[in-house]
Every structure is written in C-alpha cells, then in structure tokens.
Amino acid sequence: NGADDNASGVSALLSILEEFHHSKTAPKRSIIFISFSAEEEGLLGSKYFVNHLPVAKNAVKVMINMDMVGRLNDKKELYMGGAGTFPDGVELMKKLGEGSGLNPVVFAGDVGGSDHVTFYKNDISAIGLHTGGHPQYHTPEDDTALINSEGGALVSKYIYNALVSIANYEQPLTFIKQN
C-alpha cells in the first residue's frame, strides 16, 4: 500500500508547495521541488537527476529528503541524519524544533539510505527526515489507517520552516563531509 513509504513524503511535499504558494514567500535562493521514483530499485530516480541536473552542480546547496514522515510517535520525534553536512545545520535543525510541537532527533552524520544519499555521495549537503520505522515497513499493511495526519501536518510545517531558513541562509552553504 505504501501509505507511509512513501505517500507520506509526497503528501508533505504537496503541503509544503501549497504553503509556499499561499505565503508568497520569495526566498533568497531558488528551491527545486522534485519527487523521485525507483528508490527501492537502487535510487535510480535520484541518481538520474543528479547526473542530469537542470542547473550547475555548485548551485545545488542542500537536498532535504522526506521519506516515511507519516507515523509521528507519541514523543513527537522527527529523526534526521545529515544535518551536519552544511554549516551550522545541526544547530538550525534543533532550533527549528523550538515551539514546533516536535522533538527533532538530529544527527550530524548518519546520512541513511534514501534518495538524499545520492546527493551526499556527490558532495551535495543532504538531510534525510523520517518519523521512524515500524512493523508495516515494506508490507501491504502500510495503510492510511495508520498514518498520523496531525503529526504529518507538524512535520510538513517544520520542513517548510527548514526550507525557508536554509534558502535564506546568510552564510555560504558549503558541503561538509560526515560519516
């Protein structure tokens, strides 16, 4: 069924796009919104994109990946790896948690294994966000009845705020190699 993996990420992407549309936000840097396919087959969509970028590679500063963001737990933990791949990223992602209703669990490294890894391996800063694993992962039981819609809204708002903050970063956004 794929409700969490990864209809939840697509839903977050659409919510964030809608928020940008309504807010009329004009960030300092451009933002490319994209949804990849064939992640399970070896990150084929993200690999193709990185190998055929529509802009110069040095113009791509940070990739934020939302994969499995629909099952926010009772502790409201939003996990992310790769926050240390750009300057002050860990601090920013933690600070964005203040007043968000979420408890960000932020790792400088631990980049993970989803589409953002393709960017990281090509020296582009990358953060992967998720709300945690569950027994329904990669099973037909990954159904909409188990999605935490209110949690998904909190996660989408957090990611929107992260995008705006990163796009308006005053300092240069440079790649920092992690583990």
Task: Describe each model-derived feature in a short phrase.
Residues 36-135:
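Metal-dependent peptidase/peptidase-like ectodomains
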Residues 1-42, 159:
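Alpha-helical metal-binding/catalytic segments enriched in His/Glu/Asp
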Residues 11, 18, 22, 135-179:
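His/Asp/Glu-rich mid-to-C-terminal helical/loop segments that flank catalytic regions of hydrolases
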Residues 1-3, 74-77, 139-142:
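Short acidic, glycine/proline-rich loop/turn micro-motifs
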Residues 15-25, 51-55, 94-98, 102, ...:
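Sec-exported extracytoplasmic/periplasmic mature domains
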Residues 1-6, 79-84, 106, 146-151:
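Short, contiguous acidic/charged loop-to-helix segments that flank catalytic cores in large enzymes
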Residues 26-38, 63-66, 169-179:
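Acidic/histidine-enriched alpha-helical segments
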Residues 5-12, 45, 89, 115, ...:
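Catalytic-loop motifs flanking and including active-site residues across diverse enzymes
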